[in-house]
Amino acid sequence: MLCCMRICVCGDEGTGKSSLITSLVKGVFVTNKIQPILPQITIPPTIGTPENVTTTTVVDTSAVPQERSNLAREIRKSNVILLVYSDHYSYERVALFWLPYFRSLGVNVPVVLCANKSDLAADHTETQVIEDEMLPLMSEFKEIDSCIRTSAREHRNVNEAFFLCQKAVTHPIAPLFDAKESALKPAAVAALQRIFYLSDKDRDGYLSDKEIKDFQMRCFEKPLSEEDLVHIKETIQKTHPDSVTPSGIDCRGFIHLNKMYAEKGRHETVWIILRAFQYTDSLSLQESYLHPKFEVPPFASAELSPEGYRFFVNLFLLSDKDNDGGLNDAELASLFAPTPGLPPSWADGSFPSCTVRNEAGHVTLQGWLAQWSMTTFTSPKTTLEYLAYLGFESSDRSNPSTTAALKVTRPRKRRKRPGRVGRNVVLGHIVGAPGSGKSALLDAFLSRGFSTTYHPTIQPRTAVNTVELPGGKQCYLIMDELGELEPAILENQAKLLDQCDVIVYTYDSSDPDSFAYIPALRAKYPHLEELPSVYIALKADLDRTTQRAEHQPHEYTALLNMPGPPLHVSVTWSSIQEVFVHIAEAAMEPSTAFPRSEEDVEGKWMSWGIALGAVVCAGAAAVMIWRRVSGSGV
């Protein structure tokens, strides 16, 4: 909110500056002699004062040379300048002296041009003055926001002149309209195009009558009458007859309507629309709207809330114009039209190849939701930013922010404690020797075909998909191959333990030198022991070979007291999907993927001993019975 607006009244001597101020304060023309420079006055808000103005300070100035330093100081302190002229000479001085002088001071404030003493120019009509005097100046000097004819003697348009000054600050024309080109500026057009897109709820390219009425309520908080609706359509049809159809008003007509508002001095209407959609004076979205406060505690994570998932589901369904169950390039481009484009992290992650696609290569609904689940997990601020760009509206009155689309999971500090973690999105890092099959594992995760060509992974690669757990519950599993960043990621202990839910160790069971990479890696980064782990022997369709390592894989995992030996699997087998379930379960129930404690091992040996004892006893009893039966038969 603007706590105090300063209006600096400038102009040649004798143009009636002080009389205008006095007439504003008194409400009538003062015939008595007025002092050369009035002291500054502060006026409270009145009816018609913009809502975000609390008080207005009006400063009188003198044009005499000895007051030039005071004049410059007041101009620099002002929010708007009311430049007054009253005859041909003072009018000529507007372009020759005053406006160049303002520019020389380096000020960037709007100027309201005021033709005072209109009672003395009865032979000039309003239209003549505007066309002959004001419009040429406005086309030459962009800083002129608006113009008005006044008469302090007749108290004509005095209040309106100062009201225009207030409006020039709260609803400036300069960011919206180029008077010289007689066109809306590109930034204004872009903002209005986004507003049209968000108001077109069914994405058919037209604002229907209902959508226009909903738009009216959102922006102006009052209903639109049928007569006003008809008038709007007729106004557009006069210059753009093709923009009004039975389906509604198209974007071209909507932009033209706002251009007309700006041309006719009704740019306040345009600003009301822009601010209803969270735009600032610089035509950027408000920072607090794009980046609301949202904290994720250590060992917790961010996920989409049910309302967030609903929003992205509806957005997908609206954007899938051909109803083929996938978003093609054109549909994605249309969907992201009100945004700066794809999130940078998506481009870096080779979207859409990192998520689920159909046979045509188009992102499916499953892949779309998985991608946003991953984005929210890794960068909740990105999701919040794009929720704002895409027009998310919270249904929660207690939380109207975009943060209503997200939720924070409970921190998981003690992963070795039995039980599930309270999250639906988990992250697993895949590590292993070069050529062990990590990339093929990611391809299989996304149901991609197996390729026999080996391409070493340089840049990190990520894949995300849903996994159905035993019992029918689903979770989103993010898996990434670290590439050249593996050392940097693994040595950052704090970040690794905070973000990673499971570490997946892979080796090529047909390569004798593959497994040795894993013990060496764990020795180099001992904090990996604090993460749940899954060991996978890939390429099981090939001949298994003895590993050149201190311990064979099954011996190594046994020495660690892991719950079981490495999983043997091939990405060419249909059973590969069970591996992803196993990985997801290890992340969701981390206690099952840690080395067993001595108590667990002793308990297992005891249960084996009891079972073995029972078998021995049963066998001995059977022998005794057989002997007795045999003896009785002799």
UniProtKB/Swiss-Prot annotation:
<keyword id="KW-0496">Mitochondrion</keyword>
<keyword id="KW-0677">Repeat</keyword>
<dbReference type="GO" id="GO:0003924">
    <property type="term" value="F:GTPase activity"/>
</dbReference>
<dbReference type="InterPro" id="IPR011992">
    <property type="entry name" value="EF-hand-dom_pair"/>
</dbReference>
<feature type="compositionally biased region" description="Basic residues">
    <location>
        <begin position="409"/>
        <end position="419"/>
    </location>
</feature>
<feature type="binding site">
    <location>
        <begin position="538"/>
        <end position="541"/>
    </location>
    <ligand>
        <name>GTP 2</name>
    </ligand>
</feature>
<feature type="binding site">
    <location>
        <position position="320"/>
    </location>
    <ligand>
        <name>Ca(2+) 2</name>
    </ligand>
</feature>
<feature type="domain" description="Miro 2">
    <location>
        <begin position="423"/>
        <end position="589"/>
    </location>
</feature>
<feature type="domain" description="EF-hand 2">
    <location>
        <begin position="307"/>
        <end position="342"/>
    </location>
</feature>
<feature type="topological domain" description="Cytoplasmic">
    <location>
        <begin position="1"/>
        <end position="604"/>
    </location>
</feature>
<dbReference type="GO" id="GO:1990456">
    <property type="term" value="P:mitochondrion-endoplasmic reticulum membrane tethering"/>
</dbReference>
<dbReference type="InterPro" id="IPR052266">
    <property type="entry name" value="Miro-EF-hand_domain"/>
</dbReference>
<dbReference type="GO" id="GO:0055091">
    <property type="term" value="P:phospholipid homeostasis"/>
</dbReference>
<comment type="similarity">
    <text>Belongs to the mitochondrial Rho GTPase family.</text>
</comment>
<dbReference type="GO" id="GO:0032865">
    <property type="term" value="C:ERMES complex"/>
</dbReference>
<keyword id="KW-0378">Hydrolase</keyword>
<feature type="binding site">
    <location>
        <begin position="11"/>
        <end position="18"/>
    </location>
    <ligand>
        <name>GTP 1</name>
    </ligand>
</feature>
<feature type="topological domain" description="Mitochondrial intermembrane">
    <location>
        <begin position="626"/>
        <end position="634"/>
    </location>
</feature>
<feature type="binding site">
    <location>
        <begin position="116"/>
        <end position="119"/>
    </location>
    <ligand>
        <name>GTP 1</name>
    </ligand>
</feature>
<feature type="domain" description="EF-hand 1">
    <location>
        <begin position="187"/>
        <end position="222"/>
    </location>
</feature>
<dbReference type="InterPro" id="IPR013567">
    <property type="entry name" value="EF_hand_assoc_2"/>
</dbReference>
<feature type="binding site">
    <location>
        <position position="211"/>
    </location>
    <ligand>
        <name>Ca(2+) 1</name>
    </ligand>
</feature>
<dbReference type="InterPro" id="IPR018247">
    <property type="entry name" value="EF_Hand_1_Ca_BS"/>
</dbReference>
<keyword id="KW-0472">Membrane</keyword>
<feature type="region of interest" description="Disordered">
    <location>
        <begin position="399"/>
        <end position="419"/>
    </location>
</feature>
<dbReference type="GO" id="GO:0000001">
    <property type="term" value="P:mitochondrion inheritance"/>
</dbReference>
<dbReference type="Pfam" id="PF08355">
    <property type="entry name" value="EF_assoc_1"/>
</dbReference>
<dbReference type="InterPro" id="IPR002048">
    <property type="entry name" value="EF_hand_dom"/>
</dbReference>
<dbReference type="InterPro" id="IPR021181">
    <property type="entry name" value="Miro"/>
</dbReference>
<dbReference type="GO" id="GO:0005525">
    <property type="term" value="F:GTP binding"/>
</dbReference>
<keyword id="KW-0106">Calcium</keyword>
<dbReference type="Pfam" id="PF00071">
    <property type="entry name" value="Ras"/>
</dbReference>
<dbReference type="GO" id="GO:0010821">
    <property type="term" value="P:regulation of mitochondrion organization"/>
</dbReference>
<keyword id="KW-0479">Metal-binding</keyword>
<dbReference type="GO" id="GO:0007005">
    <property type="term" value="P:mitochondrion organization"/>
</dbReference>
<feature type="transmembrane region" description="Helical; Anchor for type IV membrane protein">
    <location>
        <begin position="605"/>
        <end position="625"/>
    </location>
</feature>
<feature type="binding site">
    <location>
        <position position="202"/>
    </location>
    <ligand>
        <name>Ca(2+) 1</name>
    </ligand>
</feature>
<feature type="binding site">
    <location>
        <position position="324"/>
    </location>
    <ligand>
        <name>Ca(2+) 2</name>
    </ligand>
</feature>
<dbReference type="GO" id="GO:0015886">
    <property type="term" value="P:heme transport"/>
</dbReference>
<keyword id="KW-1133">Transmembrane helix</keyword>
<feature type="binding site">
    <location>
        <begin position="60"/>
        <end position="64"/>
    </location>
    <ligand>
        <name>GTP 1</name>
    </ligand>
</feature>
<dbReference type="GO" id="GO:0005509">
    <property type="term" value="F:calcium ion binding"/>
</dbReference>
